[in-house]
Each structure stands twice: as C-alpha cells, then as structure tokens.
C-alpha cells in the first residue's frame, strides 16, 4: 500500500509526509522518538517526506512506559506496559484517548515538531 500511496502523492505535485513504523518500505525517512520530546514513551516512527524535514535525536536515558498490548502487561525484556489509562495518556502526551486509541496513536508532539518545520 505504501508504494501506491507514494505514487499518488508524488503525482499530486504537492508536499507530502507518509508515516509508518521502523522497517517499513519508506524512502529516506526521518525518525522521531518520544524521548526526544520529553515523553515517557519511545514510540519510534518513520516519516518519508519531500519537504527536507529533520528527524529527532533519541534520549533513551530513562526506562520507557509501554503503551501497546494490554494495560499492566509484563514486557519480555523487562518492564511493564502502563498500569493505568492516566499513566498511558501522560506518557504519550494525549489526555483524551482510550487505550485502544493510545496503542495506535502518534504523539501530538510529533505533529507539532513536523508542523513547525513546515511553517
């Protein structure tokens, strides 16, 4: 689906950004990490674009809060997912979403960071 989307976006002649996860078939993507924005999640995401945007530098000094799977799950390599919806919301910088939305969400800090580069 990404190649078809890219083709349509390029054909439009307009600026574009395609978001996806690491190892997705994006061309020269930049990477954003929640730790770069003071969030308690890492949530690495890639962004292919034709705008010459800059990625962020990870700051993996603190143990992240997992916002995926189920609440209060053990993580195989150590740690746990968020214990409460409130903790997950705070970790992601999103105060309105339910769990099923949080596990799929892109932190608003990413949108702000990219949007500020476009202005």
For each feature predicted by the language model, list its residue ranges.
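Class I S-adenosyl-L-methionine
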Residues: 1-119
């Amino acid at each position: 689906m990404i190649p078809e989307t890219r083709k349509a976006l390029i054909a439009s002649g307009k600026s574009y950004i395609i978001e996806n996860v690491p190892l997705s078939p994006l061309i020269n993507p930049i990477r954003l990490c929640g730790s770069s924005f003071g969030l308690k999640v890492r949530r690495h995401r890639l962004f292919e674009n034709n705008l010459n945007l800059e990625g962020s530098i990870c700051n993996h000094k603190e143990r992240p809060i997992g916002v995926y799977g189920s609440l209060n799950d053990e993580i195989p390599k150590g740690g746990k997912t968020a214990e409460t919806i409130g903790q997950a919301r705070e970790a992601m910088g999103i105060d309105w979403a339910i769990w099923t939305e949080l596990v799929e969400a892109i932190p608003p800090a990413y949108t702000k960071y990219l949007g500020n580069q476009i202005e």
